[in-house]
């Protein structure tokens, strides 16, 4: 679907209407609905500006901030983080590396390959983003994600150690 076309806009408006119904019902039950930027051009929320459109047009919708997805569209994760900070209700800590490994790469819109790595082992300033959130009083979750890794256990162990260190846990 071509962005900016009448068909694309109609689809986006239908999604916003459905999400508004969902967030309204969820709120009655104490549930927070989150949406994250998705690293695939078929989604009408794969870029920061598109996801922000939903944040601004769907009452009660919050951001599930995925640290690694903005690189797909060659967007700056830190700049996007600053933009979405007031909306963030949960964080997927997904690190990416430009160094080739055995994992399945995600290919960016600029045809660069991003490889899955343990949180803290890649090119993203995840610790910096976490500390800014924590310093602002954030009490939501930080989940490690290693989409495409063939070494899930190793990545999870390294990611857990990284997250515990940043969170000050033993």
Q: Language model features by range: what are they?
A:
Residues 1-63, 83:
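Active-site acidic/histidine proton-transfer and metal-coordination neighborhood
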Residues 2-3, 38-40, 66-72, 94-98, ...:
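Active-site beta-loop-alpha junctions enriched in small/polar residues
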Residues 8-11, 15, 80, 118, ...:
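Residue-level preference for long, well-ordered alpha-helices that form the structural scaffold
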Residues 15, 33, 66, 91, ...:
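Conserved, mostly hydrophobic/aromatic
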Residues 21, 54, 132, 162-165:
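A generic secondary-structure signal
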Residues 44-48, 52, 69-138:
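Gly/Pro-rich active-site loop or hairpin
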Residues 137-147:
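Short helix/strand-capping connector loops at secondary-structure junctions
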Residues 152-170:
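C-terminal helical cap(s) of enzyme catalytic domains, especially alpha/beta-barrels
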